[in-house]
């Protein structure tokens, strides 16, 4: 019986590129012997590679049975690569594209949690194009110190500031 071919997606056009490479390398190293590993590297500029050569995603994905998604941040956790895998009919690890997109956006996630009466921290969505100094002063006066500031759609702790 042939072994299941597991494509391990790593790298990608994200600020979390380096950690994705490490995650993917660890998965490739520790994949049980009953599986055949297939390293799928995505460069910072979004070019997919297999066996060290640039390839179209569809050509690569035809050679795997399942994908282990080791991508982090944008493209890997925001529903984009999940949508692509769904379009090609390739099973993969992690949440489906809609859940991934929702989970990556903190404001949308908060609304979804509140719909189900789940407690969430008090917050305010500030957009750089519509928040003047006066608005920011008013916002900061209504919240206790310290303030935790985070981009609405960045992964992990990327962009987090405690002020």
What are these regions (language model features)?
Residues 20, 121-125, 146-163:
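Glycine-rich phosphate-binding loop of ATP-grasp-fold ATP-dependent ligases
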Residues 62, 120, 142-143:
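A short, polar/charged loop/turn motif at coil->beta-strand junctions and beta-hairpin connectors
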Residues 136-149:
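Acidic/histidine-enriched active-site and ligand-binding environments that engage anionic O-linkages
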Residues 90, 118, 145:
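Short glycine/serine/threonine/alanine-rich loop segments
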Residues 112-120:
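Basic phosphate/pyrophosphate-binding loop/patch that engages nucleotide-derived ligands
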Residues 1-98, 102-108, 115, 127-138:
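ATP-binding N-terminal substructure of ATP-dependent carboxylate-amine bond-forming enzymes
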